[in-house]
């Protein structure tokens, strides 16, 4: 495990991808935690409306996973991943701003599709940029960072929701996620995304 940590720390691409996974999961997944609150307080549809919202998100997630798997290895996936993060943030805010059930379902379908697509690409990039001998340990480190971001994001959101309400907190999280993706896009090579798998293994 120590060798994996050293490998991640020394390679800009792996370091950036791991941190991106942790921060993105921190910011994105509180949406699912507070979706019942959004259904009840924003859309005023109650339990039945929440079920439809969650179903829409799930359908989008399935479509995103299948589409990403079918597309396979294509150039420019790093940029596509960042675009998906921006799309998730925009669609989620639009779902809350719509104020109506059916438009919100459509936007959440896009949210599910885009966030799963982003994380699918992110996971494949981590594996491709890791040394063969250390791939298992590198993926374990990434998985720890990714999965650790989920509960921490929801925990932090819980404290903020008490003061600002769920819509503002989720909207703020989405804004930060969009800014993160935009920053990584502008940084380009300095963020480590210019490294190809072959270059990162040297």
State the predicted function of each range.
Residues 2, 9, 35-202:
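C-terminal transmembrane bundle of multi-pass solute transporters/carriers
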Residues 7-29, 109-113:
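Pair of pore-lining "gating" transmembrane helices in MFS-fold secondary transporters
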Residues 18, 26-38, 121:
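Short helix-kink/termination motifs in transmembrane helices of multi-pass secondary transporters
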């Amino acid at each position: 495990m120590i060798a994996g940590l050293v490998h991640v720390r020394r390679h800009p691409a792996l370091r950036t991808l791991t941190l991106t996974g942790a921060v993105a999961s921190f910011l994105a997944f509180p949406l699912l935690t507070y979706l019942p609150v959004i259904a009840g307080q924003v859309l005023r549809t109650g339990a039945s409306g929440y079920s439809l919202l969650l179903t829409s998100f799930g359908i989008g997630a399935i479509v995103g996973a299948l589409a990403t798997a079918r597309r396979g290895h294509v150039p420019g996936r790093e940029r596509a991943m960042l675009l998906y993060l921006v799309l998730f943030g925009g669609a989620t805010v639009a779902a809350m701003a719509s104020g109506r059930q059916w438009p919100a379902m459509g936007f959440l379908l896009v949210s599910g599709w885009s966030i799963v697509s982003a994380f699918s690409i992110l996971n494949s990039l981590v594996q491709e940029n890791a040394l063969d001998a250390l791939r298992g340990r590198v993926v374990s480190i990434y998985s720890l960072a990714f999965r650790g971001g989920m509960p921490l994001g929801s925990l932090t959101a819980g404290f903020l929701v008490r003061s600002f309400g769920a819509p503002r907190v989720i909207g703020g999280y989405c804004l930060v996620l969009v800014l993160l993706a935009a920053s990584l896009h502008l940084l380009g090579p300095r963020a480590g995304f210019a490294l190809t798998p072959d270059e990162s293994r040297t």
